[in-house]
């Protein structure tokens, strides 16, 4: 009997041991961990540096308008000071010969012909007189009006472009005044007859002269300058159209007391670059529409 009880006890202990081992081998039941996500936070607000911020383009307005390099239009018409003193004898001309014969002091030359080409004069390049001569240039003679005072050259047309004085040589000025005083050129057109291109001569020139007035004229190229003046005093260039000159509008060298008012400058320069509205050298008291002429270079 004791043996039987001992056997039963042994079997019970063995069953318990086996039951414990089986439990150890089984994976314990676990609860699946919940998936977590990072908390969504707003991106920090940043300030863009001023150098990176998009800016709107700004417009700069100059206190004093600066003219374009090759053209300029006066803000208002100029007012000329008269240069003619005393009486004049009026002479109407229609040919180059008549024009040359009329050159004298105290004279008003009124141009009636649509065109006077100085190269058609009978004594072109060879004739001369007390008040004019011809200077030989590279490609032809240049007319020089000399030693006269109180002289007017005026076109008789309704507009300045109705009457034209011209010259063929491209190295010659169309009309030059030398050692003259009280000269008035008005209401007329001056320019070279040949098509635009390279020229070494300009349109209207004053040398060693004083009290000259160029008013209401059309001065065109291919001349290098519309008006050139050297060693002269008291000149006025008023209310003209100066255009298509290869170097520029007006040029003054060793001059004093010059006014350039109310003019329009257009198409100055050539294929190599724009021209100057005004150029001065060794001058005193040069103004353009009341401003210092040197600022318009």
Regions of interest found by a model, annotated:
Residues 17-34:
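Sec-dependent signal peptide cleavage junction
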Residues 100-105, 117-154, 164-186, 192-209:
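Extracellular beta-strand-rich solenoid/capping regions of secreted or surface-exposed proteins
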Residues 112, 146, 154-156, 178, ...:
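Feature marks extracellular polysaccharide-active and adherence modules
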Residues 1-8:
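Positively charged n-region of N-terminal signal peptides that target proteins for export
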Residues 90, 96, 106-108, 113-115, ...:
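Detector for repetitive beta-architecture
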Residues 120-121, 164-174, 193-202, 223-230, ...:
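Short glycine/acidic-rich loop motifs that flank beta-strands on beta-rich extracellular proteins
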Residues 70-127:
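Acidic Gly/Asp/Thr-rich repetitive segments characteristic of extracellular carbohydrate-active
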